[in-house]
């Protein structure tokens, strides 16, 4: 079993947003992060809109069409969203075992998009 706080998950998310570095230390190679999170580098069947509607999939990350934007999702509604360009992360802890996981995921991603747009208007 693995027990972690939201702060622990936020540290992991920031490390990923910084291409494998945290506090000046390299934890994962930038090449690994790029391979895992770049939707164009995934094999057929895992590219955008092939793995699941409106996502791609790579190395346990759900990938969005925009490069550098991806998320991890737990079975009970846990969510870590990462936008590498803006260094924005979203961490949600949950123990919801409802069956509407797909709808919950879409709503959570839309929340993440709204947060990014609000703090980084273009």
Which residues does each predicted region cover?
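Structural helix-adjacent loops and short alpha-helical linkers that scaffold large soluble proteins
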Residues: 20-28, 101
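Active-site Gly/Thr loop motif
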Residues: 34-89
């Amino acid at each position: 079993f693995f027990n972690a706080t939201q702060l622990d998950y936020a540290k992991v998310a920031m490390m990923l947003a910084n291409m494998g570095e945290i506090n000046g230390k390299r934890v994962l190679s930038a090449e690994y992060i790029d391979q895992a999170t770049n939707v164009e580098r995934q094999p057929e069947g895992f590219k955008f809109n092939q793995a699941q509607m409106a996502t791609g999939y790579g190395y346990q990350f759900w990938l969005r069409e925009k490069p550098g934007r991806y998320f991890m999702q737990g079975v009970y509604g846990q969510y870590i969203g990462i936008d590498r360009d803006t260094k924005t992360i979203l961490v949600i802890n949950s123990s919801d075992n409802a069956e509407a996981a797909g709808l919950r995921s879409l709503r959570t991603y839309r929340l993440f998009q709204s947060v990014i747009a609000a703090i980084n208007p273009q």
